[in-house]
Amino acid sequence: MPLTLSTRNPGFEAAFRALLAAKRESAAEVEDAVAAIIDGVAARGDAALVEYTNRFDRVRLSPDRLRLSPEEIAAGADRAAPETVAALRLAAERIESFHRRQLPSGIDYVDPLGVRLGQRWRPIEAVGLYVPGGTASYPSSVLMNAIPAKVAGVERLVMTVPAPDGILNPLVLAAAQMVGIAEIYRIGGAQAVAALAYGTATIAPVDKIVGPGNAYVAAAKRRVFGRVGIDMIAGPSEILVLADRHNDPGWIAADLLSQAEHDRAAQAILISDDADFADAVESAVARHLELLPRAEIARASWQENGAIILVADWDEAVALIDRVAPEHLELAIEEADSVALRVRHAGAIFLGRHTPEAIGDYIAGPNHVLPTARSARFASGLGVLDFMKRTTIVGCDAASLAALAPAAILLAEAEGLDAHALSLALRLGHE
């Protein structure tokens, strides 16, 4: 059974803190295994990559078979159902339209002292996109990760996708083909992350790695960060639904399960001001679980990590939401707009009863790669700026340098950095 809490109960605060502190991340043995895999790929390159791929994905490969040929990509994409490809194309159009609005503008101006100041944006040169291939395969993630990179102007976009038992999802290949990814490798897990970060004889290294994955992939991204950039450390999926009694309990139950079905470690939380409605949602969850193909995963997630929280009013709810800082926040209430304005910490907010989180996962337009594990307190969802770098520009002539340098010399001397001061003083004609 999910945890049930009420703000009216004396023990609420302690129980809520325990809910926030519950660990759903990877264990030490995962970190140790990932370290060994990364060290192996860094040291032995293709040989280690092939060895791990053969072991974990149960497929016999050689270095010359790691990369998919253009013919393999096209043939795989052709096997995708046409109506689903059409849906992917609609999603791609909407995702691109939204993300084009994120493109930043540069700055270039001359200040009153005559100093030219500015900043410019340039795309990252090479990005690796990790696409999962485990308990579920996600062509939508290809679009959500690749399209912002393409909009940003990334020149080289590399995709890795595991092929368990030699099988690749046709829709994943169709999505890759749709966004123009031509460099695809049939590898996954920590070994794929290592190959993208360190490079091998077959795979040139990239500058940044993005994309979701399991605990091993998350641990690998954490370990290679610094050598390459990463988008974020994605933990298990989360949803928090704020709902009143005017909702259909079956709708809200399905919304909760939409994240619970991702992973046993996923978390679904319902906050409501009506105990009878909350009970009805819990009953609806049980009914849905009798029918869902991924019921075993969803049931484990709901029973082990789910929670129902009863509040007196939306003031209490907003305070709790900000403490949870959920990845996905549904506001299935009449006052959705006004409550949304008061929420400070959420990866994405879905407004009203007719905006289920699932519409954002696929086709609304904003990115579905969002901060988890309470990191929405300081992080944002994936976007165009994640694939760009900002460089600042400073230009002085003799007059503007003469106006600014004396103050800079004083600061350099105060910090004991005499060469700094000297480089300025010499330009002023001081010995």
PLM regions: where:
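C-terminal core of ALDH-fold dehydrogenases
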Residues: 314, 322-431
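Short acidic-hydrophobic, aromatic-tinged amphipathic segments that line or gate anion-handling sites
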Residues: 3-10, 183-188, 308-313
